[in-house]
């Protein structure tokens, strides 16, 4: 005889059928056949990416169906959570929430992501860390009148952006004495005039600019 379990709940793997052999001498014999229902499971793979390629040792939590799992990426930026249930006790797919924890302050905290699983398969989610950045806006003015005097002009002055004493970029003022920098990763920088506009002496003042990462939660 072949004994098979039928109408197996969705959350379980269907167990293999079992064969039972009875002989003429087995009168009034009860044969016990044991079936073990195993939950359907799947896996979650997290790919960690960041603008500065520092992806190892990042911490994540995966929560769902009243349970929380903690995992950490390897040096390759990959973390895998294996063999977790696909369905809950009501045979409904479990919605798992993946969150990155203890994100270094230099990054914007990425949004949590949700996922449902497929039995005997790996579902992949990618988390990207964006570095916090800032821009600086500089306006050159006449020290007495703010506007240019006589034959002087506020346009054409060249300024340098420095970090740790090294020149990063140069910018030139427009007709209003203005320029705006591109985005820079948050940190401490300085602005200094390299060559003045026509009619003016060089301003040798070193102006600090920058942004402290702990004061911001967004990219810009």
Predicted regions and their residues:
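Solvent-exposed loop/turn and edge beta-strand elements of beta-rich ligand-binding domains
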Residues: 1-220
């Amino acid at each position: 005889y072949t004994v098979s379990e039928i109408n197996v709940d969705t959350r379980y793997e269907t167990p293999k059928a079992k064969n039972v052999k009875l002989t003429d001498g087995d009168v009034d014999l009860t044969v016990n056949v044991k079936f073990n229902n195993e939950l359907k499971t799947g896996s979650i793979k997290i790919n960690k990416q960041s603008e500065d390629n520092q992806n190892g040792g990042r911490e994540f939590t995966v929560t769902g169906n009243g349970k929380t799992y903690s995992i950490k990426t390897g040096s390759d930026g990959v973390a895998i959570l294996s063999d977790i249930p696909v369905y809950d006790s009501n045979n409904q797919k479990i919605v798992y929430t993946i969150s990155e924890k203890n994100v270094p302050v230099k990054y914007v905290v990425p949004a949590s992501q949700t996922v449902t699983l497929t039995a005997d398969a790996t579902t992949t989610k990618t988390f990207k860390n964006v570095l916090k950045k800032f821009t600086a806006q500089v306006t050159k003015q006449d020290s007495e009148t703010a506007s240019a005097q006589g034959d002087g002009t506020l346009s054409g002055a060249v300024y340098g952006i420095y970090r740790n004493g090294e020149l990063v970029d140069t910018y030139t003022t427009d007709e209003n004495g203005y320029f705006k920098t591109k985005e820079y990763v948050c940190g401490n920088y300085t602005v200094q005039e390299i060559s003045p506009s026509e009619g003016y002496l060089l301003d040798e003042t070193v102006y600090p600019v920058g942004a402290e990462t702990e004061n911001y939660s967004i990219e810009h």
